[in-house]
Amino acid sequence: MMWGMPNIKLKFIYLCILLFVFMASMLNSVSGLKTIFYDDFENWSGWYNYSSGAVEQSSNYAHSGIYSLRKFLNDDPNGGYKLIGKEIGRDIVMEGWIYRPLPYVSGRWDRIGIEDENFNGYSIRIEHDYNKIAIETRENGIAVNTLVITNWNPPENQWYYFKFYIYSNGTLRLEVYYENGSLGATVSAIDNIYTKFDRVVVHGGQDYYVDDLRISDLYPPLRVRYIEEYNATATVDGTGKTNYSYGLTGHIIIENTAPYKEDTLNDVWVAVDIKNNASGLRLVYNGTPKGVFIESSAPAYTNLPNANTYIHIPILPNNSYVEYEFDIDASQTLPILVNETYDVTKIPANKMSEWTVNLIVYLNKNLVPNGENVNVNVIKYLSNGQFYDNFENWTGWNQYKNGIVQWSSIQSHSGNYSLEKYGISTSLNNDPNGGYKLLPKEIGRDVVISGWVYRPSNWGGGPIDRIGLEDENFDGYSFEVNHYSNYISIDRRTNGNPTEISPEVYWNPPEDEWYYFELKIYSNGTITFSTYYQNGSLAATVSTIDNTYTKFDRVVIHGGYVYYVDDLEVNSKNFDFYGDKNWKYLEITSANSSEGTAVLFDGDYFKKDYNTSNLNAINWTNITLNWSNDSATLVFNVLGNYSYSERDNILAKYGFAKILFNYNGTNTNTSIKGVYASGSYSISTDHGTTGEINIWIENVTFKNDAKSYSFNLTNLNIWAVNKSAYELYWNPFNKSIWIDGSNYTITPNIDIPPGEVWNSKTYNFTFSGVPIVWANCSFTLSKKDYILLNEVSQIGSSYVVVEEIYVVGSYLIKVTKHIVPDADGTYDIYIVVENIGSVKTPEYVYVYDLIPKNFTVSDEWVNQSSMLIAEGNHTITTNPRYNLSMWWALHAIYPGADGDGNWNDTAEILANKTVVIHYKLNGTGEFYPSDAFIVGIDPTNSLLPTTSPKITTVAGTVENNFEIFLILINVIFGLGILTKRNIRNNK
């Protein structure tokens, strides 16, 4: 900066030498939170009654001051709300004080929410009757899902305090405190549905009081995140062995969340040390008006530490972000591992079979440091190969834009409930507004969506029924049934907005009765839409060709209102929803957990006959793992009937699950090493004469022009140069032209808040000519205004476990070999052959055994002897361990054995369901009893390799045995969670 005349101040923005460095060692140095919303209710303004509820200013009770908010008149969801003043996102905390007086007036639950313009969001729930705390989701103000619940006895007739955290990685956490400040209880859940909020809503029962209600940003405005997203699959074989396939992506997000233009950052450099990467950086999103760049080094003036990659963002405006991603070598990266065993590893076809699943989730201590908690949610679905929602349970539906979809008992095609596409304003709630539900995985073409629609004749809003399949950007296809112009057609959706791509085919759709639809999207580009009357006859069909979109991950309800949808199905040729359509029945009959809460419900992936419902899914919630509590177990029973008539075995998928976890650590050594940026500031100098000859004065002023950022002024230099000499060199840093006594270095090391000014002291120097005064500065962003975050995101992450079991058609032979030592050193051998299937075996079931060297065989018999067709043996000369091969040919074995391997089961032996083969072994010289642990079954008639011959060495009883499985069945199991509870909305 330079001035040629005395007493002239010039202002320069975005100039001078600026050092703006964030070091990784400063990572969690956030001092204080920025308040977004606060109301102490001493002045009553901005509050509105919601629905039939009422809130008012009251002096009955107050935590601070004289007044508080009183919630009264009607129970949940009725209450009151106040706008925050702007739309806010996640990474916030809502906190305040609640007072519940006795006696109760009515509903006994205190419920406060943070919601959007459609009253969708989250609320806390404090139950004074059942002594619980919970986190719940809200749709149109209605509490529809209990995400998590735990025990706490809340106080009455005294204040208690709550903190409700909503994180961008999907975590929700509620903490409640007693009036003395001690922690009462805490509970966590994972949910990603809602990301924007604009109001605080007081729901619940009556009467209760709220005071000192506050919402704060958890993080300062400049946020540099390194986030890891999982895409993992666990394969569990039911014997304790688990195979993992990994996908892991690293994301670097540089976000300026400040709201004002004056908070624009310039010349942003981010130093990143990328480790274990399988690819380079890819630009995912650029929210700036200019380009962004990847460099191998940064300019010296940034003073950034060494790193292997640098991201350069020339300008980062307020409310903007830049995101890069890269692939990670994902071996050994899951903080949560899965193990599972079954009591049986295969079942017979064409009959009801029940098996017990023992599922363990446990902490990977190689990745999670001691002292860290990982919260886990698991949701388990049984599946027979398709998406199916009969709306008897309301789960997973989200509002789209200003749309309203809700659970309704007004109309139903089957059962008691359906989805209602509702509205109150044609300008707000018509197409494209509506609702959607995510599928468990992205699917491709060759897919059919079908279901039933009911349009009442007094519908009132927009006249078009529109349902489709779309992707994460709401690109896809939907149908159009027009009740006003009487036609059907097909739309292509782009960002949710429709473009008609087919002819309009005449059809006068029925009203006040149900009609059936099918929308078929083929891989060859053809799209066909057909409608059917309630009696099953074809009504109308239209086709078109369009190849624009090929992937879909959600069902979307668009169109006008009011209309109803029921028995909604999605069937895909290329994706089986982790199930098999040959399952005629699937049910979870019981579930018990060692930790947390396991709730059974009717899921979306087992298609039943209309008007039926069964429990085929589990919500397992409120699991917290750490080094001292490193595992949790869920034991559940599955009842199923698989239709299959072939002789060969089949590995049948019967369900899937998702694991959701929050872990704010990362698994690679990738890290953000530092950040440099310039912001909006002013620097100026004053200089002039003192009135004395040749005596000059100088000082410097630093002004922070930002509105959200504070700057720490660490260093400032001021000096003067000879004007005439400067014009020869044009370099103010040439010390040969500096004026003696004019050079000063100042180290204020103070924070300059937004809009504030700092002035240096005034300095004197002597010079006979005209000086030019220069100044430069170094400053860093105040520690409270930035944060660098390493975290694992649940948004975009997938941890799916797929579940399979072997099903054997017609019959299933199980062979158990028992080796029983006798007192004289000999061994009794019992080979128990059982048919645990549903059909009699063919004749000639062959059993094979090998006799180790230095053993002799005696006392051979078969029980019953009538089951023996033939037997024989062969001498072995080519095997160093065995010298004799024995075989037995048995008559057809009847079905229905219990598979317990008992050689004394008289009832099964007499019924020819079980055959027992016996012989005695006597060792001579040096012999090896371990070599006797072998048995064989004929591969044709016994369905190898799925019969799992089993050998046991027994000390006197069948129950005391040691089992070795010669053939292990691959049983693939899956995991992952959401939670839902039945909500008692009248509290």
Curated annotation (Swiss-Prot):
Keywords: Cell membrane, Membrane, Transmembrane, Transmembrane helix. It is found in: Cell membrane. The keyword Transmembrane applies. The chain crosses the membrane at residues 12-32, 958-978. GO terms for cellular component: plasma membrane. It is a multi-pass membrane protein. To M.jannaschii MJ1393 and A.fulgidus AF2028. This is Uncharacterized protein MJ1394. The lineage of its organism: Archaea, Methanobacteriati, Methanobacteriota, Methanomada group, Methanococci.
